[in-house]
Amino acid sequence: MSHAISLDSLINLPAMGIPVVNYSPESTWEFGAAAQGYFRLPNQERTSIVQLDGTYSLKNQWYINAQGTLYFGTPDSGLRNKRASAWQLQFRAGYSDRPATYYGTYRDSHFANEGNMGMGMLRQGTPYQLQRGYLNIQAPIRVGKDWAVGPMMDMLVAQYSIAGMYQTPDPLVEAALGVVAQYDTRDNVFYPTRGWFFKVSAAAAWTSRVDIPEGQQPTINALLAADLRQFVSLPANLVLAWQFKAQMMLSEYYISHLTLYPMLPRLGGQDGLRGVNSDMFRDDIMMALQAELRFPIWSIFRGAVFAGVGDVYDYHNWHWAVPKVGYGVGIRAAINKAKVNIRFDVARSNVDPRWNNIQAYSFYLTATEAF
């Protein structure tokens, strides 16, 4: 009985703090912490979340990030569906100062012929220093039971130098305004077991400068993004989850990737194609498909096996290359009744074929699911 009371006390906590430990080839070991708070605003069925996290790596890389989703509503509107006029505020803001690696893009000729093995070994990269601040705000307004449409804004300030290749004399500033639409029938925001989620956004972005001939400088770039997920309940308390994600940065002219490199869509990372170096593959377009089978283990613990495939593409010179494949296993621990999980994943990819080298693996310890 005492064990049950202790466990119930744990999963009813309105907030939590956990250590964050990640390992990936681009950063080696990262150590930090994440704190999250969970609450329901008045007359709301869904749980709002606010998160603060940060890490410091053995390569003297650091970042701090704040993000969250707040659910608001006006159930006294008299509408048949009490959530019909609800709206939500999604935000993400942060700053990072980290040595990074410039690997180029597919339009760079020395990366065009990769072959089927050792893609990561061919991409040795050039170290560079990057300071980056960002702010993203979205405010979808409920227009039906499951649909929401609203404005969005995005701002990025970056300063960086790529040794012997490029240096920003002044910070590069990007500001974007657009619209976001989403469809959501998930039974739970943090750990869904059934339902669909679809979000698409389109924005016009202005950049402070680009390195192309005078008179051809575009004033506007197009930023497009799509995120489609499905969650399927299976027998034996299994859940099959899959996601297709695409990001595009398009412009009328052939912009130097040295200028806009930190802004380009990228593949990989702890919430993307796990196991793939998140600095290695960037270009105008990113597309990825991943799936995950989630299964019970014991008490608050669940497991997962996952795999995904994706790549980046040059909008001006589309071509086929060897797809990047990431795969791995993980374990989750549910820490409250909102179904927020502590997640530990181990992943690798076909980018580095070595099985006996730790640099071919990525480790992620964090909160919430990848998707």
Regions found by a protein language model. Give the residues of each.
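Gram-negative/organellar outer-membrane beta-barrel architecture
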Residues: 7-17, 21-173, 267, 280, ...
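C-terminal outer-membrane beta-barrel translocator/porin domains of Gram-negative envelope proteins
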Residues: 177-182, 186-298, 303-309, 313
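Short, solvent-exposed loop/turn segments at secondary-structure boundaries
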Residues: 165-166, 212-216, 316-320, 354-357
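Outer-membrane beta-barrel proteins
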Residues: 5-8, 36-43, 69-80, 137-145, ...
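C-terminal soluble interaction/assembly domains
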Residues: 321-322, 339
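Hydrophobic, lipid-facing positions within transmembrane beta-strands of outer-membrane proteins
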Residues: 15, 31-33, 62-66, 131-137, ...
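Short, solvent-exposed loop/turn segments at secondary-structure junctions
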Residues: 311-315, 350-352
